[in-house]
Amino acid sequence: MRGRLCVGRAAAVAAAVAAAAVAVPLAGGQEGSQGGVRRGSRGTTMVKKRKGRVVIDSDTEDSGSDENLDQELLSLAKRKRSDSEEKEPPVSQPAASSDSETSDSDDEWTFGSNKNKKKGKTRKVEKKGAMKKQANKAASSGSSDRDSSAESSAPEEGEVSDSESSSSSSSSDSDSSSEDEEFHDGYGEDLMGDEEDRARLEQMTEKEREQELFNRIEKREVLKRRFEIKKKLKTAKKKEKKEKKKKQEEEQEKKKLTQIQESQVTSHNKERRSKRDEKLDKKSQAMEELKAEREKRKNRTAELLAKKQPLKTSEVYSDDEEEEDDDKSSEKSDRSSRTSSSDEEEEKEEIPPKSQPVSLPEELNRVRLSRHKLERWCHMPFFAKTVTGCFVRIGIGNHNSKPVYRVAEITGVVETAKVYQLGGTRTNKGLQLRHGNDQRVFRLEFVSNQEFTESEFMKWKEAMFSAGMQLPTLDEINKKELSIKEALNYKFNDQDIEEIVKEKERFRKAPPNYAMKKTQLLKEKAMAEDLGDQDKAKQIQDQLNELEERAEALDRQRTKNISAISYINQRNREWNIVESEKALVAESHNMRNQQMDPFTRRQCKPTIVSNSRDPAVQAAILAQLNAKYGSGVLPDAPKEMSKGQGKDKDLNSKTASDLSEDLFKVHDFDVKIDLQVPSSESKALAITSKAPPAKDGAPRRSLNLEDYKKRRGLI
């Protein structure tokens, strides 16, 4: 009994395969009666062979092999259908009917008539379902072909037309011609024009000619400058146009890419939707079939109970097989539902998720500002705009002799009442910071240069969650990071520089040049007095007084060390003078108590004694001579040297008479060896001889001015 049922099912599947095979046209065949007979005979032979195989297998295989056989037959039918859809020939219904008739006739030859009737009904139902599926697939493929043809026929945006290309070529030609232009003012290199101009210049005088040429040179220089300026402007305009064209082309390319991506995404979504709809349709059909089969079973069981007749083995086995089919269909529906749910999950994953909030301290460090950056930017024009929205690590005090820091967001920039020192500059700006619900103004000097730590980041997150506030997203972090990079590469103009200079001068303690500032204030004061503005003059006078006080304070601070050094030097000088006086007194005291030493060398000067004898000394010598020889012959010897030879003769005669008595006295006479020297020389010699003698034993040492004055009694 079970073998017959398997044979019946195999026959039904074989009929479906034959119907699908008939739909495929024969290449190069002619339509006619002979062709129809051939196709019919071919279909019958194929079915007979397959049925023969099934009958043989059904007798030998077990119940487990029946399911494998059904699966193989279904896969074969699907292959045939796919081949027929790829070729897409016009399907002829009469041929299909003839094929089905031949297959029915074949079934009549092989099996009983009653069974064949039932199986024919099932074959018709299966044929209708297959035709519906083929029609749906053809419609879907037609719609997809229409979409693809529409997409291919639609012109893409951003394409450059022939007119645009021609205009661009003409513009490039004009650019090249403008670049080839040269300066020409109507004169040659020698500043002369045509023959008439040369003749006119020759008729002029040399002075007029030189003046005319000089004027032409000046005019040429002016025209050259104008020409160069115009040329530069033209080149700048060309560059701008080229840049604009490049930007437009880039934008068009971007638009094309976005359109292509959007079209791909839309086509992909359409395909996924169509597949999902098909799967949903299959699932709904399977569920409806299951419900219908269950209702049939309920009706059958109710009828059987009502009749109270014994069940047939065929009905029992058929119910089991139907239950197995139901289980298979339920498994298929579960698979289809799983695939549909997986497709939906994939679509959800493909949708770009919303920007995630910050979850790591490294992500927040990208928009952290250090004290060094704030010091550089505090006077810049973009400071308030760039800083707002960034984060800082602010110090809030000490705990157990350790500094405590918090992560805070900058919500604004304000000016405080106190001017303080920030690195190398001075400012009065403060930051309005927010940590959770708490807001407070801090000076820039309390900002840290270090990065956020893990504990500080977690405390900030807890404060934000407790306050019910949202964390910054990664998109916001990226935007703020771009603004910080723009601030680092900011290009200053003249107005920005003037504002920065004014901002720095506001908080400067003292001007860089006191003299220039003082002269400027004096001029302003004189102008105010001339105009009669006494209030302004008074204000300027107050500024002058403050400036003088600052200058004096700086001078005192500058000369503080210098005055201390000069005081030390003066004190040392006075001490040296006192010590030198003490040394001189001690030295003189030692010289007095010192005994004469014959072996010591003494400083002495020779004295010239020629013609320098004093009259008193000469008289003493003569007296000694007279006393020695016992005669007073020379009483008048100490007379003037100017009397000369007369006196010498008298003296010689007198001595000769006295000495003649003794022979020894004849040889006893004085030979005068003194020479007569002019009076000026004698005076000079006398002056030199009157030099004060040096003190015996006193050391020679240099005297300073104060010692000299003390010795002279001037002090």
Swiss-Prot record:
Name assigned to this protein: RNA polymerase-associated protein RTF1 homolog
Q: Which PROSITE patterns match?
A: PLUS3
Asked if the keyword Protein biosynthesis belongs to this entry, the reply reads: no
- The UniProt regions of compositional bias labelled Gly residues, in chain numbering, are 29-38
- Gene symbol? Rtf1
Q: Where does the record place Basic and acidic residues bias?
A: 197-218, 246-256, 274-296, 637-652, 697-709
**Organism the protein comes from:** Mus musculus
* Keywords (A to Z) from UniProt: Activator, Coiled coil, DNA-binding, Nucleus, Phosphoprotein, Transcription, Transcription regulation, Wnt signaling pathway
Matching entries from PANTHER family are given as:
RNA POLYMERASE-ASSOCIATED PROTEIN RTF1 HOMOLOG
Cellular component GO terms held in the UniProt record: Cdc73/Paf1 complex; nucleolus
Q: Does the keyword Magnesium apply?
A: no
Q: What does this protein do?
A: Component of the PAF1 complex (PAF1C) which has multiple functions during transcription by RNA polymerase II and is implicated in regulation of development and maintenance of embryonic stem cell pluripotency. PAF1C associates with RNA polymerase II through interaction with POLR2A CTD non-phosphorylated and 'Ser-2'- and 'Ser-5'-phosphorylated forms and is involved in transcriptional elongation, acting both independently and synergistically with TCEA1 and in cooperation with the DSIF complex and HTATSF1. PAF1C is required for transcription of Hox and Wnt target genes.
Q: Which residues carry this modification: Phosphoserine?
A: S58, S631, S660, S702
**According to the UniProt entry, which residue ranges have a biased composition of type Basic residues?**
115-135, 233-245
Identify one Pfam family in the record.
Answer: Plus-3
Q: Which domain of life is it from?
A: Eukaryota
**Which terms in the Gene Ontology molecular function aspect does this entry carry?**
single-stranded DNA binding
